Amino acid sequence: MQVYSPSKISQQLETFLNSVANGLGHTMSHAMSQTFSETIVASVAKKAPKTSVLAAAQAAMQAEDKVSKPKKVKKTKSYADAAPKRVKKVKAPKEDTVVSEPEEAVVEQQEKQQPEKAVVEQQEKQQPEEAVVEQQEKQQPEEAVVEQQEKQQPEEAVVESEQPEQPEQPERQQQAQPERQQQAQPERQQQAQPEEAEDAEQEPVEQPTAKPKKVRKTQTESEDKPKRG
């Protein structure tokens, strides 16, 4: 089975209807010409002279043309009746509307594009301002770095001032150590001398209570001296 598209079917119908209309028109025109020639032309030829026969023949030919032309118009009508929907689709009002709509659409698009251009110009104006703001933001961290460096410099100066004081401390410690050693040596000598005196006194006379107290006093005094120094 062959499948035909609507366009092919419509073409076949057109050819068929045209052939039928042409056949009918040909037969009708032939019949009408015969009747016309038999009735009108014969009567005119009988009444008119021979010169008028040519005029009658021309009139008959013109009449045939007039009769055949309306039949051709009927052919188009029959096709319009066969496919009325397609005839309705092709109408002038639709073409007018199609032409008017794009013009309005073009005007609306132009109106829409104009504010878009204005927005683009505003953005271009804003961009240099944003660039200036970015430059200022870049300059600010540089200033902050300079301030930090200035703050760090006095701190470094303080550290440097503290560093020379450090060597004085070991010098003081070194000075304090020989002083303590010198103080410790006489204390030991003083402690050793009363012990020898106690041994010498205990042999002839036993007085354990009075003199040891004096020795304790000397020990306390000798212990207090380095603390005060």
From Swiss-Prot:
Residues 166-194 have a biased composition (Low complexity). Residues 195-204 have a biased composition (Acidic residues). Residues 61-229 are annotated as: Disordered. Residues 109-128, 218-229 have a biased composition (Basic and acidic residues). It comes from the Viruses. This is Uncharacterized protein 050L.
